[in-house]
């Protein structure tokens, strides 16, 4: 009964982690599409000067939504990554392969780099569409488009990080899982009969 409850509890935890992973990757995808929509909204505003567009309120709002989704997905990626490590550590499944460990660390590093880079690009696009700008400057008209593509890249890197972490630890867990034998399957060990000890007491 206790083993069944423990297995059911572990299954529920793994299911929750999988749902959170899907939501995290989904937030990255939503951020990418919103960034592309912000780029499309910015293209509709009229030119004030050459290669310089007027601020777009729609692009400004969509940019805020995109960077919010990216930030939420980034925080969730790190929290879920730590949860996966803690879960398999509790189950006694920590991979001893250094290559797998280095690969996971590289993916985590890429998640931070891509997340920060995407947030900075989207923030630049948001700033370029603020109504409080004193003058229109020469800016890149494809900022939101680049930011949206970076959000898609963040989703891909996060997915690779999750899959590599789960597969490596689950494989190690199955290899190191002890084989439990039932008491009925245990065979008695045959014992050799003890030799008769010589009688040390003299006969009367």
Curated annotation (Swiss-Prot):
The glycosylation sites are: 179
The principal localisation class reads: endoplasmic reticulum
Location comes to: Endoplasmic reticulum membrane
Q: Which InterPro entries match?
A: DEAL/Modifying_wall_lignin1/2 (IPR009606), DESIGUAL (IPR052222)
Q: Which GO terms describe its cellular component?
A: endoplasmic reticulum membrane
Keyword set includes RNA-binding: no
Q: Which organs or tissues contain this protein? A: Only expressed in inflorescences.
Q: Which gene is transcribed and translated to give this protein? A: DEAL4
Family affiliation: Belongs to the DESIGUAL family.
**Span list, region Disordered:** 177-204
Stored PANTHER family: OS07G0462200 PROTEIN-RELATED
Q: What is this protein called?
A: Protein DESIGUAL 4
Looking at the UniProt entry, the stretches that span the membrane are 13-33, 60-80, 107-127, 143-163
List keywords of the entry alphabetically: Developmental protein, Endoplasmic reticulum, Glycoprotein, Membrane, Signal, Transmembrane, Transmembrane helix
Highest rank taxon of the organism:
Eukaryota
The record gives the membrane topology as: Multi-pass membrane protein
């Amino acid at each position: 009964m206790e083993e069944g409850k423990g297995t059911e509890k572990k299954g529920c935890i793994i299911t929750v982690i999988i749902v959170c992973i899907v939501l995290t990757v989904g937030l990255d995808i939503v951020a990418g599409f919103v960034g592309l929509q912000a780029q499309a909204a910015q293209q509709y505003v009229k030119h004030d000067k050459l290669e310089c567009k007027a601020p777009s309120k729609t692009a400004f709002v969509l940019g805020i939504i995109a960077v919010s989704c990216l930030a939420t997905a980034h925080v969730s990626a790190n929290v879920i990554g730590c949860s996966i490590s803690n879960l398999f550590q509790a189950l006694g499944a920590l991979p001893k392969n250094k290559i797998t460990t280095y690969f996971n660390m590289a993916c985590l590093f890429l998640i931070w780099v891509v997340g920060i880079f995407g947030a900075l690009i989207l923030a630049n696009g948001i700033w370029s569409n603020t109504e409080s700008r004193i003058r229109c400057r020469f800016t890149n008209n494809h900022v939101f488009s680049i930011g949206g593509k970076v959000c898609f890249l963040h989703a891909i890197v996060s997915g690779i990080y999750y899959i590599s972490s789960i597969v490596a630890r689950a494989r190690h867990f199955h290899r190191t899982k002890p084989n439990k034998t039932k008491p009925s399957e245990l065979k008695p060990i045959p014992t050799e009969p003890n030799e008769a000890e010589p009688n040390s007491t003299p006969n009367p």
